[in-house]
Amino acid sequence: MALGFAGCALPRDPGLGSKFRDDFERTGLGKNYFDTIGRYRIINGKLNIEKAYNNPLWLRRRLPRNVEIELDVMSRSKDGDMKIELFGDGESFARDRGAYVASGYVICMGGWHNTKSFIARRLEHGREGIDMVSRTDVKVVPNKVYHWRILRQGKELRWYVDGELFLSYHDEEPLYGRGHDHFGFNNWESDVWYDNLRIEALSD
């Protein structure tokens, strides 16, 4: 099993403030992101990645404890596998192509060759109902744009897809604080596109 790996410690990132938005209407990633593999790129106003092998693109902003995240996601691959990480450490990445131990929660739609969607607390291959919750009844349709909305309030993490509750996860010891305060885009092999990222702090 490959542990998430952190290289040299990065300077402390600024807080989110009340909100953060990114429509990717530019040519380069810019200073707001840390690319752990050097393969993330912006094409025609959208963020694109494939073959990242669990090397995230981290947003250089610290998340508040309670937060709402919205974004549009599309896969051009039949394998689906659209993925983000939240409340991670902002710098870790997989050292090899073995099982990945994330530093935060992993949210994935159409993972494992489009057979499973899940919320996982660090362990993508963890115990159902303990480390993760999942469903197998939904397949990602290639080239279809999905709108994701994720809410973390207290011990509850809720994930909505196109306005409908998709999965929820209850965590008695929610990840938060230093080492668990960043958002990241992630990927295995699929050709995935992201757009219209919005992150907003919620009241306690």
Predicted regions and their residues:
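C-terminal motif of bacterial Sec signal peptides marking the signal peptidase cleavage site
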Residues: 6-7
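Extracellular carbohydrate-recognition regions
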Residues: 10-36
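Short tryptophan-centered beta-strand motifs in secreted/extracellular beta-sheet-rich domains
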Residues: 24, 69-71, 144-153, 157-159
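Extracellular glycan-recognition surfaces and repeat-rich motifs
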Residues: 27-53
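Secretory/extracellular carbohydrate-interaction modules
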Residues: 51-122
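Beta-strand-rich interaction surfaces with strong enrichment in secreted/lumenal proteins
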Residues: 55-61, 134-140, 183-184
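Short, aromatic/His-centered strand-loop micro-motif at the edge of beta-sheets
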Residues: 124-147
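Flexible glycan-contacting loops in extracellular carbohydrate-active proteins
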Residues: 169-195
